[in-house]
A protein has these predicted regions:
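Sec-dependent N-terminal signal peptides
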Residues: 4-13
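Cyclophilin-like peptidyl-prolyl cis-trans isomerases
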Residues: 11, 17-192
């Protein structure tokens, strides 16, 4: 009996270690599929998934779009009201993941441990956002776009305007309709 329980525990642990959570960010410009790195950013992925499960992102906008840098969303409504968020999470920027083109990372204030719901997708390799860069602590990467970079690039091309206190606000609202969490598949199954 003990042997069976041990074997079952190993199977469950091994199976979950191979699972790769994936989400689809449905926007008014199209869909963006993101593979989340639960192994390297467990707290950040759990935080993002909880917001997604609670439908928090539905109706929020990409409120900050800077061509040649990044697109940011997940915290403001179309009228630029900030949605009430949960408590901030610890910054997992020292996880080895880099702010490279197509990666998703947590937005935050100057306090390294202030990230809540807002995230950004890198349009280029942003080395200054990695630990040791311009902001010594860095911005926590927790996944990468696997499909829909054309949508990300299209969002980056939308004209922006100043709407104090915000700058770089898309003149045309780019709304996140929902964030769909896909059933998890093992990394091995994805390779086939």
């Amino acid at each position: 009996m003990t042997k069976r329980l041990f074997s079952l525990s190993l199977c469950l642990a091994f199976g979950s270690a191979l699972a790769t959570p994936t989400v689809i960010i449905h926007t008014t410009k199209g869909d963006i599929t993101v593979e989340l790195d639960e192994d390297k950013a467990p707290a950040t992925v759990a935080n993002f998934r909880r917001y997604a499960e609670d439908n928090f992102y539905s109706g929020t906008i990409f409120h900050r779009v800077i061509p040649g840098f990044m697109i940011q969303g997940g915290g403001h409504t179309a009228d630029l009201q900030e949605k009430p968020a949960r408590e901030p999470i610890a910054n997992e920027a020292h996880n080895g993941l880099k702010n490279a083109r197509g990666t998703i990372a947590m937005a935050r204030t100057s306090d390294p441990h202030s990230a809540t719901s807002q995230f950004f997708i890198n349009l280029v390799d942003n080395d200054a956002l990695n630990p040791g860069g311009a902001d010594n602590y860095g911005y926590a990467v927790f996944g990468k776009v696997t499909s829909g970079m054309n949508v990300v690039d299209a969002i980056a091309k939308v004209p922006t305007e100043k709407r104090p206190p915000h700058a770089n606000v898309p003149a045309e609202a780019i709304t996140i309709q929902s964030v769909e969490i896909l059933p998890e598949k093992s990394k091995e199954a994805k390779r086939k």
